[in-house]
From Swiss-Prot:
Keyword Ribosomal protein: yes
HAMAP family reported for this sequence: Ribosomal_uL23_B (MF_01369_B)
GO CC annotations on file: ribonucleoprotein complex; ribosome
Matching Pfam families: Ribosomal_L23
GO molecular function term, any single one: structural constituent of ribosome
Family in the record: Belongs to the universal ribosomal protein uL23 family.
Function noted in UniProt: One of the early assembly proteins it binds 23S rRNA. One of the proteins that surrounds the polypeptide exit tunnel on the outside of the ribosome. Forms the main docking site for trigger factor binding to the ribosome.
Protein's GO biological process: translation
UniProt subunit comment: Part of the 50S ribosomal subunit. Contacts protein L29, and trigger factor when it is bound to the ribosome.
Matching InterPro entries: Nucleotide-bd_a/b_plait_sf (IPR012677), Ribosomal_uL23-like (IPR013025), Ribosomal_uL23/eL15/eS24_sf (IPR012678)
Record's protein name: Large ribosomal subunit protein uL23
Alphabetical UniProt keywords: Ribonucleoprotein, Ribosomal protein, RNA-binding, rRNA-binding
């Protein structure tokens, strides 16, 4: 079993974008930003424990950080790992349920 401290560090937060919203409405899928070294098993365990829902599957991808310039200095944004978490039928996770 994965320890509780690690599970809290795996999920960084929900990813809110047009594509993520469309996935949530149509496919019962929630998109999270996760730790770059998190595994699919850790992500599944963290979502099931923290939100008390059943997860069907997890797909992950890493987006490379953009190169940015400020004057003569050049830097690079950090890479971000995203997790598309597909919930089982009948399960629901609503982050903005109380907002009106």
């Amino acid at each position: 079993m994965i320890n509780e401290e690690r599970l809290l560090k795996v999920l960084r937060g929900p990813l809110i974008s047009e594509k993520a919203t469309m996935a949530a409405e149509g496919n019962n899928t929630i998109v999270f930003k996760v730790a770059i070294n998190a595994t699919k098993k850790e992500i599944k365990a963290a979502v099931e424990k923290l939100f008390e829902v059943e997860v069907k599957s997890v797909n992950t991808l890493i987006t490379k950080g953009k190169t940015k310039r400020q004057g003569l200095r050049q830097g690079r944004r950090s890479d971000v790992k995203k997790a598309y978490v597909i919930l089982k039928e009948g399960q629901d996770l609503d982050f903005v349920g109380g907002a009106e």
